[in-house]
Each structure stands twice: as structure tokens, then as C-alpha cells.
């Protein structure tokens, strides 16, 4: 009986995720979600990195795992079979420095961008978990420096690569 209930839940989730509205939204937005070149150079500003470095006395980083209920997130859930499919990183407790690889709310170019916290609960069935992880000031600085390098080098966000777990990026 438990297997039947699990199958029923999976089918219901699939029906919701693959609804006509979700598919239309994904197809319409597909060009924005599939960058095969590093197009997102410098999306994080010098001001962002100044603020991030001001947090070095806070010996934590903050990880936010979310289920925003977006069409892309719902389809990703079909493949991962996980409720939470998006991760964000912040250097401060108030999430002023929160970033992730995202296409966000019509962000272009998609890639490494600041998150817009208000969109985490845009849909009624959205949910988040936030973690505070201890880190030394030196390691936190190294993380900020690594993100700064990625930001300078450029990056791409590719939904197909995310689902297939294969990087399609080209420099």
C-alpha cells in the first residue's frame, strides 16, 4: 500500500510540474535559462564585494535552501525527487549579500547573481531552510575571493546542464 501511495504522490507531482502553464512558461523562458557561453561577467559589483568583506568579523556563512515553486524548480524536482532544489549563499545574517546561480525573476543574463529575497515566498507552497555555518575569517575571505574570481572570469547558467548534471558551458 505504501508503494501505491508513493506512486500516486509522484504522479500527482509530475502532473503539477508538467502542467500546460509550467511547460509554456519554461519554453517561453528557455533562451534565458540556457547560456552556453560565459556571459555573466561582473554581475556582482565592487560595492557587493566591499560589503561582503565587511562581514569577515561574522564567523559564519549562511546557506539558504529553497523551494520557490517556480516552474523550473518544479521540473527539477521531478528529476531530483527532492523538495528543495535551489541553494543560495550569504555572508551576512540579514541576507544582504545573498547570491546564487539563478535566472531569478527575469534576471538577464542568468548566472551568478544577487538573490531577491522577496521572491523566495512568491508562491503559497514555497518553503526555505536557512543554515548558519561556522567559518574562520580566513576561510570566509577565501570564499569571497573565489566568488570574486568567478565573477571576473564570467559564468553561465544552463537549465539543461543542471537537469542532466553535465556542464555545457563554453568559454
Tell where the protein language model's regions lie, with residue ranges:
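Cysteine-nucleophile amide-bond enzymes
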Residues: 1-171
Amino acid at each position: 500500500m505504501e508503494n501505491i501511495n508513493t506512486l500516486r504522490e509522484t504522479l500527482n507531482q509530475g502532473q503539477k510540474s508538467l502542467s500546460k502553464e509550467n511547460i509554456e512558461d519554461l519554453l517561453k523562458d528557455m533562451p534565458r535559462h540556457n547560456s552556453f557561453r560565459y556571459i555573466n561577467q561582473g554581475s556582482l559589483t565592487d560595492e557587493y564585494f566591499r560589503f561582503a568583506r565587511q562581514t569577515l568579523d561574522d564567523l559564519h556563512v549562511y546557506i539558504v535552501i529553497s523551494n520557490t515553486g517556480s516552474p523550473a524548480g518544479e521540473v527539477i524536482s521531478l528529476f531530483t525527487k527532492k523538495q528543495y532544489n535551489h541553494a543560495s549563499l550569504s555572508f551576512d545574517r540579514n541576507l544582504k549579500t545573498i547570491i546564487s546561480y539563478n535566472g531569478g525573476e527575469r534576471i538577464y543574463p542568468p548566472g551568478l547573481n544577487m538573490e531577491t529575497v522577496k521572491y523566495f515566498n512568491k508562491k503559497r507552497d514555497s518553503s526555505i531552510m536557512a543554515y548558519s555555518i561556522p567559518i574562520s575569517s580566513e576561510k570566509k575571505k577565501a570564499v569571497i575571493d573565489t566568488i570574486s574570481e568567478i565573477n571576473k572570469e564570467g559564468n553561465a547558467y544552463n537549465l539543461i546542464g543542471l537537469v542532466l548534471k553535465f556542464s555545457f558551458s563554453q568559454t
